[in-house]
C-alpha cells in the first residue's frame, strides 16, 4: 500500500501521475518462510522504460532509507485492516489465509491477532525490512518485456544494488 497498490502509493504518484512514465504501476509481495517475492508491475511505452526503471529504483531506495511517513503507515494500516476483515466474509479467502499462516507461522492466527500485530508495526520496522531486502546479495532482479527492457532492467538493478 505504501510503495504500490493504490492511487496514493509512491510509485503511482511519481511514475504515473507526476512524470507520466507508466499507464499502470503496482507493487506486491508474497512472503514465505525462508524466502519471498516483492514484485513490481509497470506498463509503459518502450521509450520510457529506462527512465521508469530509474524512478522506480529511486522510490524503493528512498522508502528503505527514510521509511514511510506516519501518514503513509496509518493509511496502509487502515487499508490492510479493512482487507483482513473483508476477507473473513469469503470462505475461499479465509481458508487460503489460514493455510498460509500455518505454512509461515506454524499455526493459524485470528483476525484480531493479525490486526493487533499490524497496529504494532512502526516506521522504523518498515525501514529495517526495506534495508534488509535491499542488502547486497539478498535480491535478484528479473525484467520481462521486449529486448529493450533488458537495458532498463540493468539500470534498475544497478540503481538499487550498485
Regions found by a protein language model. Give the residues of each.
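Proteolytic maturation boundary segments
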Residues: 135-162
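A short, acidic, amphipathic alpha-helical segment used as a generic capping/interface helix at domain edges
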Residues: 121-133
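A conserved active-site cap/scaffold subdomain adjacent to cofactor or substrate pockets
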Residues: 1-11
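M16 family metallopeptidases and their MPP-like homologs
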Residues: 12-121, 136-145
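Residues within well-ordered alpha-helical secondary structure of globular protein domains
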Residues: 1, 58, 79-82, 132, ...
Amino acid at each position: 500500500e505504501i510503495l504500490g497498490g493504490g492511487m496514493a502509493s509512491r510509485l503511482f504518484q511519481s511514475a504515473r501521475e507526476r512524470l507520466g512514465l507508466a499507464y499502470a504501476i503496482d507493487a506486491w509481495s508474497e512472503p514465505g518462510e525462508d524466502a519471498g517475492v516483492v514484485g513490481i508491475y509497470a506498463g509503459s511505452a518502450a521509450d520510457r522504460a529506462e527512465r521508469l526503471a530509474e524512478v522506480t529504483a529511486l522510490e524503493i531506495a528512498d522508502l528503505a532509507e527514510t521509511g514511510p511517513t506516519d501518514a503513509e503507515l496509518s493509511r496502509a494500516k487502515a487499508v490492510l485492516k479493512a482487507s483482513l476483515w473483508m476477507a473473513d466474509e469469503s470462505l475461499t479467502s479465509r481458508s487460503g489465509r489460514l493455510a498460509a499462516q500455518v505454512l509461515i507461522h506454524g499455526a493459524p492466527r485470528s483476525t484480531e491477532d493479525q490486526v493487533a500485530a499490524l497496529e504494532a508495526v512502526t516506521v522504523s520496522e518498515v525501514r529495517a525490512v526495506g534495508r534488509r531486502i535491499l542488502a547486497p546479495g539478498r535480491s535478484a532482479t528479473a525484467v520481462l518485456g521486449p529486448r529493450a527492457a533488458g537495458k532498463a532492467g540493468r539500470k534498475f538493478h544497478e540503481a538499487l544494488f550498485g
